[in-house]
Amino acid sequence: MTTRIDTRFAELRKQGRSAFVTFLMAGDPDPATSLAIIKALPRAGADIIEIGMPFTDPMADGPAVQAAGRRALDAGMTLTGTLRMIGEFRKDDDSTPVVLMGYYNPVYIYGVEKFLDDARAAGVDGLIVVDLPPEEDSELCIPAMKAGLNFIRLATPTTDDKRLPAVLANTSGFVYYVSITGITGSAAADSTAVGAAVGRIKRHTSLPVCVGFGIRTPDAARGIAERSDGAVVGSALVDALSASLDAEGKATSGTVQAVASLAAALAEGVRSARQAAE
């Protein structure tokens, strides 16, 4: 089964460029504004959209993404609401891949079978569940694959050649390489080291390898895009959203444009990587 993710990477290969992948938290700062931002991302140049599932204990997230999750939860966002929002997005956009990213607990409480049915119906294309290792593939990974969803694994600088085959065994869509050891937004990515790491991963898989964590500027995005199949930006976009809010943490008239403007600049950085490599 070919997913939107597979189709998008095939298109990008023909164009000779890497993907620009965005991350934002569902429902941040409120459901209506969140939907408006997500609708604006493809127009700004996003090739793939990752949407965070708000959770009360996000252990891999840095302060910015944790704050985004708190804002979303305070605004009443739920997993049901997240899926409903994606369904609304799909009314306007049937081609941009959407990946849900988060933790297993909300999915478990929702019910795995019901979650997969509802996610597929809403238009979700893939899942990244950061706290489910390959040893737990029977919990969600295998059922997701059977439901036609890509299950995207994380590889890190500490994932050695002995561990990689297990990480990659049931991975589909793309591999998400975490360029730094730590929480989101905590450091800058080293594009030279990333290039070596991506090359090592590609010796084990034919899947695209996208790189995230530590990409905050168009120049950084270009450097990563020159050395990988995609640059993932989350914390910088979340910071732009946060900076646009009023004193009470509510959306302003400039919130959507603040995020879209940064996304457009980052997208241009990614697209310039192809030009630099030619």
Curated annotation (Swiss-Prot):
EC class: lyase
Active site location: 50 (proton acceptor), 61 (proton acceptor)
EC identifiers of the protein: 4.2.1.20
GO molecular function annotations of the record: tryptophan synthase activity
Pathway(s) where this gene product acts: Amino-acid biosynthesis; L-tryptophan biosynthesis; L-tryptophan from chorismate: step 5/5
Reaction equation(s) it catalyzes: (1S,2R)-1-C-(indol-3-yl)glycerol 3-phosphate + L-serine = D-glyceraldehyde 3-phosphate + L-tryptophan + H2O
Signal peptide (residue range): none
Keywords: Amino-acid biosynthesis, Aromatic amino acid biosynthesis, Lyase, Tryptophan biosynthesis
Keyword Disulfide bond attributed: no
Gene Ontology CC entries for this record: cytosol
Source organism superkingdom: Bacteria
Cysteine-cysteine disulfides: none
Lyase is among the record's keywords: yes
Pfam families: Trp_syntA (PF00290)
Subunit structure: Tetramer of two alpha and two beta chains.
Chain's role: The alpha subunit is responsible for the aldol cleavage of indoleglycerol phosphate to indole and glyceraldehyde 3-phosphate.
Family: Belongs to the TrpA family.
Name of protein: Tryptophan synthase alpha chain
Organism of provenance: Nitrobacter winogradskyi (strain ATCC 25391 / DSM 10237 / CIP 104748 / NCIMB 11846 / Nb-255)
